[in-house]
């Protein structure tokens, strides 16, 4: 449904007021149309008699049925239609994994691809699709002949393919600006599907912090050692979501990991702050690891590069013997399962089947 309102410049405030009043109604109309199309397509496959299908269509578009939709919403409306026909519409479900992305093909499949495969194994009844949020990476991949969708492109594709239930699972570490944009984009598409919801990144709720610390320890990313420190490099942004990193470091101390420190490329703690903490102790060795899903450009260049401005070089300039781990978080099966756990929580309210 499209709408155009104009007063030819005579009363633009009136045009705006009319639009403000009509847009919610049009949004409801779009959702109603989606419901009707879903029911009609289901009945075409399950009810051979055309006359019976036409009768049902008249019933679900009658004034009392439309009033039910307006007053009680789509769930009550679909239940009413199911009672009339005796048939529950078949939902078509997709999981959309949303990542910042990386242009490094091998790394991409070892990390992002590995998370997606773990999700597909846990939820075999759903189809798994991919979207990247970095426009620079999307552009570069397309130039190299690899197609990947943005979030809006992916949701448009899923709509055209007839999916009715969408679960978006981000693979971010923290809820920064990319996650905020994902939520904004997804909100625009809610009326295009019967159900659309967005999961949470690795660090979102209080329980996520000790869980991730335990998972990293079990995966060998960090360890209690008296003479060796561990420095984790996160991305970080100027967004409030970057507060997850100092909170994570606080949890490290609470869990007894006094030798594990966190720094970020674009937020807090900075590398300088992490160095200041390191110098308070007598460590001579530092294990440098990415606190990033994928070991892309930031790991290869900013963290482990041989140039003097890399984290590895700066640590060596400060007298530390540095061991570099370049494997992104997504390559560890236990980390993959943390994303699966978040998605499981998101899908639980829909009673969606899974394989344990």
Name what the model sees in each region.
Residues 1-5:
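Rossmann-fold NAD(P)-binding glycine/threonine-rich loop
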Residues 7-82:
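An accessory alpha-helical subdomain
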Residues 84-356:
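Active-site-proximal alpha-helix that buttresses catalytic centers in soluble enzyme cores
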């Amino acid at each position: 449904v499209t709408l155009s309102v104009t007063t030819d410049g005579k009363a633009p405030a009136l045009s705006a007021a009319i639009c403000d009043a009509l847009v919610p109604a049009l949004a409801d109309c779009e959702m109603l149309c989606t419901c009707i199309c879903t029911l009609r397509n289901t009945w075409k496959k399950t009810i051979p008699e055309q006359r019976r299908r036409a009768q049902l269509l008249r019933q679900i578009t009658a004034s009392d049925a439309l009033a039910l939709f307006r007053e009680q919403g789509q769930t009550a409306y679909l239940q009413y239609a199911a009672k009339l026909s005796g048939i529950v519409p078949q939902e078509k479900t997709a999981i959309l994994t949303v990542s910042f992305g990386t242009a490094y093909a091998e790394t991409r499949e070892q990390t992002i691809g590995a998370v997606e495969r773990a999700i597909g194994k846990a939820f075999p009844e759903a189809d798994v699709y991919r979207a990247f949020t970095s426009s620079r990476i999307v552009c570069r991949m397309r130039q190299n002949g690899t197609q990947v969708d943005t979030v809006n492109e992916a949701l448009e594709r899923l709509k055209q393919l007839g999916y009715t239930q969408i679960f978006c699972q981000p693979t971010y570490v923290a809820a920064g600006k990319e996650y905020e944009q994902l939520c904004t984009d997804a909100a625009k598409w809610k009326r295009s599907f019967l159900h659309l919801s967005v999961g949470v990144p690795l660090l979102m709720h209080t329980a996520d912090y000790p869980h991730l610390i335990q998972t990293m320890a079990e995966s060998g990313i960090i360890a209690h050692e008296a003479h060796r420190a561990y420095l984790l490099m996160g991305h970080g942004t100027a967004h409030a979501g970057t507060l997850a990193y100092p909170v994570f470091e606080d949890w490290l101390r609470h869990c007894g990991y006094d030798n594990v420190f966190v720094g970020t490329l674009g937020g807090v703690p900075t590398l300088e702050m992490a160095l200041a903490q390191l110098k308070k102790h007598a460590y001579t060795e530092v294990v440098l690891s990415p606190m990033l899903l994928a070991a892309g450009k930031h790991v290869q260049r900013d963290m482990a590069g041989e140039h003097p401005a890399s984290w590895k070089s700066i640590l060596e300039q400060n007298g530390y013997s540095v061991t570099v781990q370049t494997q992104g978080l997504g390559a560890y099966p236990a980390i993959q399962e943390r994303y699966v756990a978040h998605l499981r929580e998101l899908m639980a309210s829909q009673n969606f089947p899974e394989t344990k």
